[in-house]
Swiss-Prot record:
It catalyses: (2R,3S)-3-isopropylmalate = (2S)-2-isopropylmalate. It is an enzyme of class 4 (lyase). Belongs to the LeuD family. LeuD type 2 subfamily. This is 3-isopropylmalate dehydratase small subunit. One of its GO terms (molecular function) is 3-isopropylmalate dehydratase activity. It comes from Methanothermobacter thermautotrophicus (strain ATCC 29096 / DSM 1053 / JCM 10044 / NBRC 100330 / Delta H) (Methanobacterium thermoautotrophicum).
Length: 162
């Protein structure tokens, strides 16, 4: 995965990722139009498919809503790389097919606009000649992500009758 870095602070909550007034929407493409607008109203028009969000601690805190990772998916975010994540957001994002990569100290190493590559197999973020490690995902989570999320994963395994 290769793309541009968009940087955000600590404690970005789900209401910032997608404001509550848009919870009537379920379509990721519609949610995309409002993703992160609380911090950067122009973000939806600037972000490109394959870009990365790099954030501080506790990304995805606040309300437990699937709309937040769906909005990121609709925006084409390749992965969110953060110092740490809120636990429920972490599972919701994996379930909809968004990789979340925990990389302590990453906000000191990457800048907005950096072009990076993420190597999930090696567990590294690459910027030019520099490599920064992240906590590798468990194999079962990688499988879920490779299938596009939990429901496609279960359908392919034959464990989902829906």
């Amino acid at each position: 995965m290769k793309g541009k870095v968009w940087k955000f602070p600590d404690d970005v909550d789900t209401d910032i990722i997608i404001p509550g007034r848009y919870l009537v929407m379920r379509d990721p493409e519609k949610l995309r139009e409002h993703v992160m607008e609380g911090l950067d109203p122009e973000f939806p028009s600037k972000v490109k498919p394959g870009d990365f969000i790099v954030a501080g601690k506790n990304f995805g805190c606040g309300s437990s809503r699937e709309h937040a990772p769906l909005a990121l998916k609709g925006a084409g975010i390749a992965a969110v790389i953060a110092e740490s994540f809120a636990r429920i957001f972490y599972r919701n994002a994996i379930n909809v097919g968004i990789p979340l990569l925990e990389a302590p100290g990453i906000t000191e190493k990457l800048n907005e606009g950096d072009e990076i590559e993420v190597d999930l197999d090696r567990g590294v973020i690459i910027r030019g000649d520099d490599e920064f490690p992240f906590k590798k995902l468990p194999d079962f989570m990688v499988e879920i992500l490779e299938k596009g999320g939990l429901i496609p994963y279960l359908k392919k395994k034959g464990d989902f009758k829906g």
